[in-house]
Amino acid sequence: MGAMAVPFAFGGSAARAAISDPAIAWSYRDRASAYWNSIVSGGEALVESLGKTKDSLVSLINEGSSEKSLADIKAFLAKTGGKCAIACDANDSPNARPVVEAVRDAGAYISTIWNKTDDLHPWDIGDNYVSHMTWSDEKPAEQTARILFDAMGGKGGVVHLGGIAANNPAIERLNGLKNALKDFPDIELLDAQPADWDTTKGTELMASFLTRFGDKITGVHCANDNIAYGVIEALRAEGIENMPIVAYDGNPEAVKLVMEGKLLATVFTNPHWGGGITAALAYYAATGAFKPSEEPKEHREFYGPTVLVTKKDAADFKAKYLDAVPSYNWKDFWGPSNGQIKYK
């Protein structure tokens, strides 16, 4: 973000009377996914940078339930008397508003990622809703689709296995596929169905697609890595090898599969940084280190970074991001970010 990507100048007149030692929580889907584990590892790195132990980061695991997400956050607000900072993926977009309103009403602070409705903005809620970060998934998903279509020889049938239908990233990743299809008239989208980001559901859905479409399927576009693992299992069960498949998230297992040629591509969103910086924004706003309403809008709603990973660069990518996790300055809030969110 050019000149905007500088650490906040702490101290001096920026400091305000606020919460001296806020409890810190991350509200997220599950620990079964390498993606969410990496998000949490970022949150743990943030609390360790504050001289706290990893287990001082409270995990509010919603198990894919928006109702549980909201209930757990309300319980945490009650337990802490609102003296807390929360990082959160609201699970689906409509749930973000009741979550951030509950946080505001308790006098706590929250930063969100991925899911919110387009009409909900931090500056409309106030300083207690510090920031929202998402990732601009449409273009990277279009890139993976083009890689897939080239591998298919520009013809044949493709199926898409998506995330939770109401999730912003699920919508954007399917849109990316559809954008790429416009340039490939000889490729047919046979079907697109949600697999809820889940490996088991990915296996079941791919098995169903194979039953319905058989050898009409010549390529598979997956909304995340977990789904792709399930697709590979379903194909293996039918003795199908070398099916072109693309995925998304850049998890370690997926990068290994890219290096082995079992996946054509995945997209990395740096969840470790995302998990740490989202918690950091909420924490430092809560302590009064900065006042969100004094920041420009591109610091309240912004895109996170994305990196396309293909076989030719997978080894270098693995060495840079996975073999040793980079260390980050958790006060450099917007360093790797990618500009203000744009709405259609």
Q: For each predicted feature, which ranges?
A:
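Hydrophobic alpha-helical
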Residues: G43, S69, A85-A108, L177, ...
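Flexible loop/turn connectors
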Residues: I240, V246-V309
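Extracytoplasmic "Venus flytrap"
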Residues: D21-G42, L46-L50, L57-K74, A87-P94, ...
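Flexible loop/hinge segments that line or gate small-molecule binding clefts
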Residues: V99-K139, G157, N251-L257, L263-L264
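N-terminal export signals
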Residues: M1-A14
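Hydrophobic alpha-helical segments within soluble ligand-binding/sensing domains
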Residues: S69, S131-V158, G202-T203, A254, ...
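Hinge/cleft segment of the Venus flytrap/periplasmic-binding protein
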Residues: L161, A165, A180, L281-K344
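Short, solvent-exposed amphipathic alpha-helices that sit
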Residues: Y35-K52, P140-T144, N168-E188, K201, ...
